[in-house]
A protein has these predicted regions:
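Conserved Radical SAM active-site core
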Residues: 34-36, 46, 93-98, 102, ...
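Residue-level signal for the start and early helices of compact helical domains
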Residues: 16-18, 88, 92, 130
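Alpha-helix initiation/capping motif
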Residues: 8, 45, 83, 121-122
Length: 144
């Protein structure tokens, strides 16, 4: 949703987990019927989608653009699965080697949301990826 030239990492992980359970996952289209729509945005200033255009049973909004304290379900957060197929226009992989931060900057919510820096397991790479974009906030601060 944010349109900042990167795929939404949370949606990629959610899509992979839902597909692994046998659910059909696709981008929502107006006037189509859906049991559930998952929406995620990183920034509060990102305009919201008009969900009234959808025939949907439930809309679940997540990400720091909606709720600073919200978290992905633990099974999704701990999964290495990532569905790059929902973003075919991006020819790269996304990767984090740590989450959290060593600092407590007043303008940033990473430390509040993710805690102190800790190493995380790398996620699956894009099978069609030509390079890796490392989105690690503290790549050089991680002692491991």
């Amino acid at each position: 949703m944010d349109g900042h030239n990167f795929p939404n990492f949370a949606l990629m992980r959610l899509s992979a987990c839902y597909k692994a359970k046998g659910h059909r996952v696709e981008w929502a289209a107006p006037r189509q019927r859906y049991d559930k729509v998952l929406a995620s945005k990183v920034f509060t200033f990102t305009p919201d989608y008009d969900y009234d255009l959808l025939d949907v049973g439930e809309v679940v909004r997540g990400g720091t653009g909606y709720d600073r304290a919200g978290r992905l379900p633990e099974a999704v957060e701990n999964s290495r699965m990532t569905d790059y197929s929902i973003y075919p226009e991006y020819p790269f992989s996304l990767q984090f080697f740590s989450r959290g931060c060593i600092r407590k900057c007043p303008f940033c919510l990473v430390r509040e949301k993710e805690g102190y820096i800790q190493t995380v397991e790398p996620v699956e790479l894009n099978p069609k990826g030509k390079w890796i974009e490392v989105l690690d906030n503290n790549f050089f601060a991680n002692p491991q």
